[in-house]
């Protein structure tokens, strides 16, 4: 049987919010079975809980943000959400003392390090998966994203199309058979990226105030400005894949199926997930409880070495 997972104990980290520029202290705490991922704003009195689910995503401007009916938010959750998906974490309390998750280095890797540092505990309940039964497609102009049935795991195929000298001749398509190992080694270190020409406008809108060469890949009109260059030759499309993994984990369960997308982003990823969940005949919840049952997605174990 493949079981639900949480952490063995609590762990804390401090960083800066990518868009707010504010210092953030974040604490991960183990949660009971069937809790899901729950974000808590501990700077508010009383503390406000925001469960991670697709319907709570009410802002997708340059990030994924959970926002409740009162307007309380936790923003920029996508990189952490991707790390939780990659590590197969089902149940967790995420406490933050600010409206945003810290950006760390702009990738999911520091979150994975924190999760591995304290260790993962299996719980006495079967892990649930969302298995795709029917194809679903959403579009926005020339952009599109879709799910298809696929019983052998979670297969992802994502393509971007940026018209910029740095992207010319560079692979802008990424295909992934999702697993804990493939995520950690091939995707998790890909950083968020942005263009110098956009930064002044973004900051005038109180966005990207915490962005820097320490937590993002920055491009001018011709080149990458980071002295150390790229972590992967195709880091840009891999970061978009990372974002999609995080956005699609807003159902609190790993997906068994195929995801294909062209020029997708946070809004379209969320639109696709909502469209799927709204069509009950298009998916089913499955578990692998038999003694010999093997789930089609393999997750981190203590033998996995960080990339």
Curated annotation (Swiss-Prot):
Enzyme class: hydrolase
Alphabetical list of InterPro entries matching this protein: Ribosomal_Su5_D2-typ_SF, UDP-acyl_GlcNac_deAcase, UDP-acyl_GlcNac_deAcase_C, UDP-acyl_N-AcGlcN_deAcase_N
Biological process terms in GO annotation: lipid A biosynthetic process
UniProt keyword list: Hydrolase, Lipid A biosynthesis, Lipid biosynthesis, Lipid metabolism, Metal-binding, Zinc
Binding, Zn(2+): 79, 239, 243
EC number: 3.5.1.108
SUPFAM superfamilies: Ribosomal protein S5 domain 2-like
Pathway: Glycolipid biosynthesis; lipid IV(A) biosynthesis; lipid IV(A) from (3R)-3-hydroxytetradecanoyl-[acyl-carrier-protein] and UDP-N-acetyl-alpha-D-glucosamine: step 2/6
Domain of life of the source: Bacteria
Gene Ontology CC, one term: membrane
Protein name: UDP-3-O-acyl-N-acetylglucosamine deacetylase
Tagged with keyword Metal-binding: yes
NCBIfam families in the cross-refs: lpxC
Cofactor(s) the record lists: Zn(2+)
Family membership: Belongs to the LpxC family.
Keyword presence, Lipid biosynthesis: yes
Catalysed reaction, written as an equation: a UDP-3-O-[(3R)-3-hydroxyacyl]-N-acetyl-alpha-D-glucosamine + H2O = a UDP-3-O-[(3R)-3-hydroxyacyl]-alpha-D-glucosamine + acetate
MF terms (GO), sorted A to Z: metal ion binding; UDP-3-O-acyl-N-acetylglucosamine deacetylase activity
One Pfam family matching this protein: LpxC
Active-site residues annotated for this sequence: 266 (proton donor)
Gene symbol of the encoding locus: lpxC
Function statement: Catalyzes the hydrolysis of UDP-3-O-myristoyl-N-acetylglucosamine to form UDP-3-O-myristoylglucosamine and acetate, the committed step in lipid A biosynthesis.
């Amino acid at each position: 049987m493949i079981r639900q997972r949480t952490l063995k104990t609590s762990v804390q980290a401090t960083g800066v919010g990518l868009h707010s520029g504010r210092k953030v202290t974040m604490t991960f705490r183990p949660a009971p079975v069937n809790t899901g991922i729950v974000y808590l704003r501990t700077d508010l009195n009383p503390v406000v809980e925001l469960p991670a689910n697709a319907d709570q995503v009410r802002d997708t401007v340059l990030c994924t943000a959970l926002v409740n009916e009162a307007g309380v938010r936790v923003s920029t959750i996508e990189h952490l959400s991707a790390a939780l998906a990659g590590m197969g974490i089902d149940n967790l309390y995420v406490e933050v003392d600010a409206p945003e998750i810290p950006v760390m280095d702009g990738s999911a890797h520091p979150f994975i390090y924190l999760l591995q540092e304290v260790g993962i505990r299996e719980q006495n309940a079967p892990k649930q998966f969302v298995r795709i039964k029917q194809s679903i497609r959403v579009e926005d102009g020339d952009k599109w994203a879709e799910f298809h049935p696929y019983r052998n795991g979670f297969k992802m195929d994502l393509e971007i199309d940026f018209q910029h000298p740095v992207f010319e001749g560079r692979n802008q398509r990424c295909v992934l058979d999702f697993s804990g190992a493939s995520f950690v080694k091939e995707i998790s270190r890909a950083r968020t990226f942005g263009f110098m020409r956009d930064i002044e406008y973004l900051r005038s809108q109180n966005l990207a105030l915490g962005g820097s060469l320490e937590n993002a890949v920055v491009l001018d009109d011709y080149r990458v400005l980071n002295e150390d260059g790229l972590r992967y030759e195709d880091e840009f499309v891999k970061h978009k894949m990372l974002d999609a993994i995080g956005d699609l984990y807003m159902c609190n369960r790993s997906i068994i199926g195929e995801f294909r997308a062209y020029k997708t982003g946070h809004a379209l990823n969320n639109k696709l997930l909502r469209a799927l969940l709204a069509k009950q005949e298009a998916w089913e919840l499955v578990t692998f409880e038999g003694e010999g049952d093997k789930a089609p997605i393999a997750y981190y174990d203590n033998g996995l070495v960080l990339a």
